[in-house]
Amino acid sequence: MPLPDLLPIAPFTRPVRGEVTLPGSKSLTNRALLLAALCDHPVVLTGALFSEDTQLMVAALRRLGLTVFANEPARTLAVSDQASAFQAKAPVDLFVGLAGTAARFLTALCAAAPRGVYRIDGVSQMRKRPMRGLIDALRALGAEVRCTEREGFFPLEIHARGLRGGPVEIDASESSQLLSALLMVAPLARAATQITLTSDVRWTFVEMTFRLMAEFGVRIDHAGSSTTFEMKAGRYSAPSRYAIEPDATAASYFQALPLVVGGTLALPGLRPPGDGLQGDSAFVDVLARVRARAAGQLLEENFHEISDTFLTLAAITPLLAGPTRITGIAHTRQQETDRVAGMARELMQLGQRVVETRGELEIHPQPLRLGETIETYGDHRFAMSFAILGCRDVRGDGRPWLSIRDPACCAKTFPNFFELLATLRQKSLAD
């Protein structure tokens, strides 16, 4: 059933119980799709995410000539016919919507292709997201990448002739996806490639890329430096089946839910911190510190490495026992929306005292203002984070006190989020 434009959040009146089957990781699904497309044999991805972002990636790979068979009930994506890719004689148009992973990865893939003309564009918000670091690096490796409207941004037109390899520098300060995209296509170059990072970067996502590439048969030599990476020219080769981990960022909402409403939730298959490929699994450690802090004590958390989860914590700070300072989030001003400014605005609308700087938020809990509507700015993480806050029975009678505008934006990464939340609420009443 389609979600309404304005969704009142029905609070939990009893503690949550049960378990949640999490969707597959978006970051891993789109990386694995790219690497599977670069193998020389069919690859089946199990536990894959089915959402707008991954569907955009799948649609683009099909337009590039690959076969991708999607079985949503089984949560599998089968990639084959790699030899048929990049054969089109006419220009190929690719649409990436607002999917940052698809946008960056496909740009690098098309630049590394042996032939063809590729035009890549997205929605208006995507045209504001940074691409310059990747574009400059691809050009330095011999790619012809044209920015057809504004330099450093979409839309792009790529006249492919492969990459020559050799030394190249990249500034990935605006998004680690820029570096990950370059790393994944570097083995396609005609000669070994030495990539030197010239900026700070979120290492958890880069480490994810390193480890996934290794599982697909390509290892990276750090060349005696933590910021220079060398890759020989070669091909990827993966097992015929590859399992995608459950999404650790999506898990953060359901890890926070028991803190808001009481009870316990099981999240089958979710890897603990340090065990899997996803840095966002460390959010559970943040919640442990939230629970342990003394009443009135300032809690400070640096989210630089796990910034996709900062909204989960920020949204529930009105319920916490003291002020919270969230740092390391300046780069999130250039994601789906300006997440720092948006979060400050919505919390203040709910009556909270918020101090906002370039890369920090400090929230001082105040009595919640009831009957407000949360603007999501088309950003799925705003919708899901504030939905968890709305699950607290603030009125004490089970009546909704908070509404979410455009809840359907969750389709970007977690299409059935609100359905799962409603199921958990009903189950809590039955227990």
UniProtKB/Swiss-Prot annotation:
Query: Where found, per UniProt?
Result: Cytoplasm
- Report the SS bond pairs: none
Name the positions where phosphoenolpyruvate binds. Answer: 26, 100, 129, 177, 339, 381, 412
Which PANTHER family would you find in this protein's record? AROM/DEHYDROQUINATE SYNTHASE (PTHR21090), PENTAFUNCTIONAL AROM POLYPEPTIDE (PTHR21090:SF5)
Q: Which GO terms describe its biological process?
A: amino acid biosynthetic process; aromatic amino acid family biosynthetic process; chorismate biosynthetic process
Q: Which Pfam families match?
A: EPSP_synthase (PF00275)
Q: Which family does it belong to?
A: Belongs to the EPSP synthase family.
What keywords are assigned to this protein?
A: Amino-acid biosynthesis, Aromatic amino acid biosynthesis, Cytoplasm, Transferase
Q: Where is the active site?
A: 308 (proton acceptor)
Where would one find coiled-coil regions in this protein? none
Gene Ontology CC: cytoplasm
Major enzyme class: transferase
Query: Which purpose does this protein serve, as stated in its record?
Result: Catalyzes the transfer of the enolpyruvyl moiety of phosphoenolpyruvate (PEP) to the 5-hydroxyl of shikimate-3-phosphate (S3P) to produce enolpyruvyl shikimate-3-phosphate and inorganic phosphate.
Put simply, this protein is called: 3-phosphoshikimate 1-carboxyvinyltransferase
Q: Which domain of life is it from?
A: Bacteria
Q: Which reaction does it catalyse?
A: 3-phosphoshikimate + phosphoenolpyruvate = 5-O-(1-carboxyvinyl)-3-phosphoshikimate + phosphate
Q: What is its main location?
A: cytoplasm
For the ligand (3-phosphoshikimate), the binding residues are 26-27, 31, 175-177, 308, 335
Q: Gene name on record?
A: aroA
Per the record, the pathway is: Metabolic intermediate biosynthesis; chorismate biosynthesis; chorismate from D-erythrose 4-phosphate and phosphoenolpyruvate: step 6/7
Q: Sorted alphabetically, which InterPro entries does this protein's record hold?
A: Enolpyruvate_Tfrase_dom (IPR001986), Enolpyruvate_Tfrase_sf (IPR036968), EPSP_synthase (IPR006264), EPSP_synthase_CS (IPR023193), RNA3'P_cycl/enolpyr_Trfase_a/b (IPR013792)
Instruction: Please name the HAMAP family in this protein's record.
Output: EPSP_synth
